[in-house]
């Protein structure tokens, strides 16, 4: 216990020293930071003083500026109050005359109206850094626009046409405030309000007269400029230097632009600013917005909404044509009725409000998805046709012969079209004026031609070249459904159904036929004829397998075109009825032929090969089945092992649960032990404190052991100790006197059962006297009293005595071996070994040392505790 107390005391001392060192270091750091901060604070104070000086200078400059501004504003106010106010001119990019008119209105208003000035208050609040100076002048003109020339009535100079008693109000308000200005002398605020509202009934006459004179002067200037321009043009004409810049446009676009000419002139005269756009569109301004129109129909709709525009253009815009729509069979499309084969001379005119007369003809073509289906089905039927050559050879010969005749007809038409194109190129050499006259008076080169619509049986005849547009469409699906019916009724129904489907599914593709580009014209015609030839060649197979329309377009005479259309309907209806029944038979015959050929071609070698392959397949299948069975057996055998593993896992999980419970209990015990250890340490500390107190109280005491007791009790303890000192320590009396406080036997009561005499406890005045006696007793080794040997020791507590008693056996062995052992306070073993003193606090420490030292271990032998 004494060892633990010493270790605790040493730890406390170390901690105290560490705390002192830490506090000392912190104090030094604080002193250093104070030294570093001091110059920084000095610099900051200096910077602040410099900034304040600069700020004062700036404030003085600001005061000077404010004084100058105040003086200028005072001068301006005086000028305004004296009737010298000037109003800035208003800039207007559209009319230069508006500026002068506006200035005159304001001057007249200022002359006839009075001005009132109010100066209100002084000593207003003025801030340090804010300045708000406002100067407003507002002129509200309630008279409306003054730019139109027809604004005033020429017969009456006092009244206006739109408002008989229209008045003009001019309101000028000028406001000036000086606020938030730092002034040392005082605060001033000037607020000026200048308002002027007065009707202009008295001065209308003079004002209107002045406006009329100005407008007359402007008209004269405009006339002079026009005359100058005309004179310059005449001079240039005389000199032969007239230049005209015209866009290089085709004749069709020029003809279209002529339709807008009358409309253009009327709009230009009424200041609508019309323009021709590049896409042959008309644009003009209406209500401040630019309106664009691509055709007369859109313009007519807009005019119907605007009454003013409708009245202007009522003589120019054509009336709508009513279209009589019949039934489904005879209903002709609106665009096809209004198509125009337009050229430089506008041949074959048909009235149209749109721009469709730019195109030769609008042809309807199948969708791209349907064309792909046609191509795939054509490939399938081409294979069937090769097999069907023997059965239907005669029908194919007739069809090909008819197609060759039809191919020869467009070749002749191409020559006629080339001749017409050459004639049109010669006509293009004439000027624009001749073209306008020819379009209005002469007939075109295409007069006498016919536009034939075989689908709806409509013809447009002319005298020259005959053009026919034939749309032949067949639908095989509708024909296959009606195979059982009569041929005549079947033909009529199929043609009607195909015409209906074609009108729904086809797309419109316009072919431009501009007369100015003769090369393009030839190419377009050649492409059209070439397409007709290709489509006629593929007419029979496509009609057999698909229900999509396949169109043909050819140029021929009226009689030939009608015959061709009639023959084509017959051919297609005949082929549709014959091939549908023949295809199924051919398929069956082909399947039989292929089977027979396949069986005949198989030879013996091929049969052997097939047998070998079959055997190999069988063997491989059997092997795979065996392997699968083996794997299944292995799985079954391993199933028991899996079950055992599952059981073992269950056991392990149960054991784990038990272990967790035990660990929890052990943790609880450890917590309890930790609590017990805390209590034990507290008890040990308290005991150590008690022992220390007891040891200090016994520090001046000596025990005398072995002095016999007399029955008479004549000899007292004090006399006995004096005799012992005189007998054994006579030299100590010479140097100093040993003062004894008390001496008595312990315990105070006599125990008759006790065999040994009681100890005598002697207490000295000083602990130094006690130490002298103990040191002398160690040197003498033997102390006697009246010839008997006695023992003299220090007075110690029971705890220290118990701790020292543990060293008794070790002490004896070391004493016998000559190591000079001794027990130090409170219970330390010390002995000499190899010229050094070894000190041990506990027996465990001594045992560890002996085990590592073989010499000591040999000497001590079995006496090691």
From Swiss-Prot:
Residues 370-508, 590-612 are annotated as: Disordered. The gene is L1TD1. It holds the Pfam family Tnp_22_dsRBD. Belongs to the transposase 22 family. This is LINE-1 type transposase domain-containing protein 1. The modification N-acetylserine is found at residue 2. Residues 376-440, 472-483 have a biased composition (Acidic residues). The modification Phosphoserine is found at residues 2, 154, 472, 476, 478, 518, 561, 573, 640, 648, 665. Residues 498-508, 590-608 have a biased composition (Basic and acidic residues).
């Amino acid at each position: 216990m004494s060892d633990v107390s010493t270790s605790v005391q040493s730890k406390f001392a170390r901690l105290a020293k560490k705390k002192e060192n830490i506090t000392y270091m912190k104090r030094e750091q604080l002193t250093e930071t104070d030294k570093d901060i001091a110059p920084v604070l000095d610099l900051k104070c200096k910077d602040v003083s410099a900034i304040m000086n600069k700020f004062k200078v700036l404030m003085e400059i600001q005061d000077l500026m404010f004084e100058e501004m105040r003086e200028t504003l005072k001068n301006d106010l005086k000028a305004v109050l004296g009737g010298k106010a000037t109003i800035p001119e208003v800039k207007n990019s559209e009319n230069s005359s508006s500026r002068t008119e506006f200035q005159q209105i304001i001057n007249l208003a200022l002359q006839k109206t009075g001005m009132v000035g109010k100066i209100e208050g002084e000593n207003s609040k003025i801030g340090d850094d804010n300045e708000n100076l406002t100067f407003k002048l507002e002129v509200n003109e309630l008279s409306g626009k003054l730019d139109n020339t027809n604004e005033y009535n020429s017969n009456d100079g006092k009244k206006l046409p739109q408002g008989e008693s229209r008045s003009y109000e001019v309101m000028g308000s000028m406001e000036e405030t000086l606020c938030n200005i730092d002034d040392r002398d005082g605060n001033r605020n000037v607020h000026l309000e200048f308002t002027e509202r007065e009707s202009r009934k008295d001065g209308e006459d003079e004002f209107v007269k002045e406006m009329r004179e100005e407008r007359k002067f402007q008209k004269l200037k405009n006339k002079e400029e026009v005359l100058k321009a005309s004179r310059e043009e005449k001079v240039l004409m005389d000199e032969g230097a007239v230049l005209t810049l015209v866009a290089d446009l085709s004749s069709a676009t020029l003809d279209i632009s002529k339709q807008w000419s009358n409309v253009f002139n009327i709009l230009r005269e009424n200041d609508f600013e019309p323009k021709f756009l590049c896409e042959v569109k008309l644009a003009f301004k209406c209500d401040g917005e630019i309106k664009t129109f691509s055709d007369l129909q859109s313009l007519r709709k807009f005019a119907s909404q605007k009454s003013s525009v409708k009245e202007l253009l009522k003589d120019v815009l054509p009336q709508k044509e009513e279209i009589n729509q019949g039934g489904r069979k005879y209903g002709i499309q609106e665009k096809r009725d209004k198509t125009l084969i337009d050229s430089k001379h506008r041949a074959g005119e048909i009235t149209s409000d749109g721009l469709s007369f730019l195109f030769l003809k609008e042809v309807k073509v199948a969708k791209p998805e349907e064309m792909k289906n046609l191509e795939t089905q054509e490939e399938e039927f081409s294979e069937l046709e090769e097999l069907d050559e023997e059965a239907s050879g005669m029908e194919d010969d007739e069809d090909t012969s008819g197609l060759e005749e039809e191919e020869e007809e467009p070749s002749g038409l191409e020559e006629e079209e080339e001749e017409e194109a050459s004639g049109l190129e010669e006509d293009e050499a004439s000027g624009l004026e001749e073209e306008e006259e020819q379009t209005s008076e002469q007939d075109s080169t295409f007069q006498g031609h016919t536009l034939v619509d075989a689908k709806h049986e409509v013809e447009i005849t002319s005298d020259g070249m005959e053009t026919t547009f034939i749309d032949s469409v067949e639908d095989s699906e509708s024909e296959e459904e009606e195979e059982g019916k009569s041929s005549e009724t079947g033909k009529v129904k199929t043609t009607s159904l195909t015409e209906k489907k074609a009108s729904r599914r086809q797309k419109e593709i316009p072919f431009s036929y501009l007369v100015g580009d003769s090369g393009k014209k030839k190419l377009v015609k050649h492409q059209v004829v070439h397409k007709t030839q290709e489509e006629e060649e593929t007419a029979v197979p496509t009609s057999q397998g698909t229900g999509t329309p396949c169109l043909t377009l050819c140029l021929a005479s009226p009689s030939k075109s009608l015959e061709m259309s009639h023959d084509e309907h017959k051919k297609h209806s005949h082929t549709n009825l014959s091939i549908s029944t023949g295809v199924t038979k051919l398929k069956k015959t082909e399947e039989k032929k292929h089977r027979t050929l396949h069986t005949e071609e198989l030879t013996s070698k091929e049969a052997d090969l097939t047998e070998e392959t079959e055997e190999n397949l069988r063997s491989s299948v059997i092997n795979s089945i065996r392997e699968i069975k083996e794997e299944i057996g292995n799985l079954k055998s391993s199933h028991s092992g899996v079950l055992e593993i599952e059981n073992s896992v269950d056991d392990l999980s149960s054991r784990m649960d038990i272990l967790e419970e035990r660990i929890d209990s052990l943790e609880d015990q450890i917590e309890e032990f930790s609590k017990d250890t805390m209590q034990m340490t507290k008890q040990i500390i308290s005991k150590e404190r008690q022992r220390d107190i007891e040891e200090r109280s016994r520090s001046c005491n000596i025990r005398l052991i072995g002095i016999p007791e007399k029955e008479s009790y004549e000899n007292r303890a004090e006399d006995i100790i004096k005799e012992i000192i005189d007998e054994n320590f006579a030299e100590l009396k010479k140097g100093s006197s040993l003062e004894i406080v008390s001496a008595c036997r312990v315990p105070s009561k006599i125990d008759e059962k006790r065999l040994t005499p009681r100890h005598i406890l002697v207490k000295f005045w000083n602990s130094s006297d006690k130490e002298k006696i103990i040191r002398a007793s160690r040197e003498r080794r033997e102390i006697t009293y009246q010839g008997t040997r006695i023992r003299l020791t220090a007075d110690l507590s029971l705890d220290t005595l118990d701790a020292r008693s543990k060293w008794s056996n070790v002490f004896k062995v070391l004493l016998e071996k000559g190591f000079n052992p001794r027990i130090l306070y409170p219970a330390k073993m010390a002995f000499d070994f190899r010229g050094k003193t070894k000190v041990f606090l506990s027996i465990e420490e001594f045992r560890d040392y002996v085990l590592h030292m073989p010499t000591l271990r040999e000497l001590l032998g079995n006496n090691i505790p």
